Design a protein with these regions (language model features):
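A short, gly/pro- and small-residue-rich
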Residues: 4-10, 167-182
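A short helix-to-beta-strand connector/capping loop
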Residues: 44, 130-137, 170-173
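Residues in the short beta-alpha loop(s) of Rossmann-like NAD(P)-binding domains
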Residues: 100
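Short, contiguous acidic/charged loop-to-helix segments that flank catalytic cores in large enzymes
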Residues: 61-63, 68, 109-121, 176-183
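N-terminal Rossmann-like dinucleotide/flavin-binding domain of flavoprotein oxidoreductases
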Residues: 105-149
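Rossmann-like dinucleotide/flavin-binding elements
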Residues: 68-97, 138-146, 150, 158-167, ...
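Flavin-dependent oxidoreductase catalytic cores
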Residues: 1-74, 78, 82-89, 162-163, ...
Length: 205
């Protein structure tokens, strides 16, 4: 498909690589430890973090439905947009309900830093796909009662909520990671970062 899209001058339709190196590199433990086998010996184990069909097209083949439905997707992040994309390709009529004024969800914060250009490329690709596929997107539309959808199927794609440390004195002054990364809440000169995972390390950096 990559070559076909280039030949058809449809380069913008190619899903961008985010350089995660998690699936496509020769990193599988096929013979005990990473990188001790020839690439040709592990090609069948290649995967892609942003394209489930990579080397698994039979498993993830998108089959057309015989009974198209209107499906309401609550949340317009990456998960919601991918759900809408696949549903549309299957022949359904997905409708995205996003309570904010833009698509992207937590991925907007995840791609905010200057060195996260590849993530921003992926986010832009999803937005283009929503437009090109003609998927209905309702921004500033917070869903409060799914009964309004009647019997239509509903997909919840709202993501996770941050854990508030209410037992810690002064928690009301805390800034949530996404708030900082999006620049919506400032911090002082001396900052205590609670959590040393990838997000905490990125914020400390």
């Amino acid at each position: 498909q990559w070559i076909t899209k280039l030949m058809a001058d449809e380069g913008d339709d190619i899903r961008p690589c985010i350089l995660c190196h998690n699936g496509c590199f020769n990193m599988c433990h096929y013979k005990g430890v990473p990188n001790d086998q020839a690439l040709s010996d592990s090609l069948h184990l290649a995967r892609c973090a942003v394209n489930a069909e990579t080397m698994q097209w039979n498993k993830h083949y998108i089959k057309k439905t015989n009974s198209p439905k209107t499906v309401h997707i609550i949340g317009g992040g990456i998960g919601g947009m991918e759900t809408a994309r696949v549903l549309k390709l299957r022949g359904h009529n997905p409708i995205i309900h996003e309570k904010s004024g833009e698509l992207g969800g937590a991925f907007i914060a995840a791609s905010a830093e200057s060195y996260k250009g590849k993530l921003r490329d992926l986010l832009a690709w999803y937005k283009r796909r929503m437009e090109k596929l003609g998927i209905e997107v309702r921004l500033n539309d917070e869903v409060k009662d799914i009964a309004a959808f009647g019997g239509d199927p509903v997909v919840i794609a709202t993501g996770a909520a941050p854990r508030l440390l209410r037992h810690v004195p002064g928690y009301e002054k805390m800034v949530e990671a996404c708030e900082y990364l999006r620049g919506t809440k400032p911090v002082g000169e001396r900052v205590a970062v609670i959590g040393g995972g990838l997000t905490g390390s990125e914020i400390a950096y």
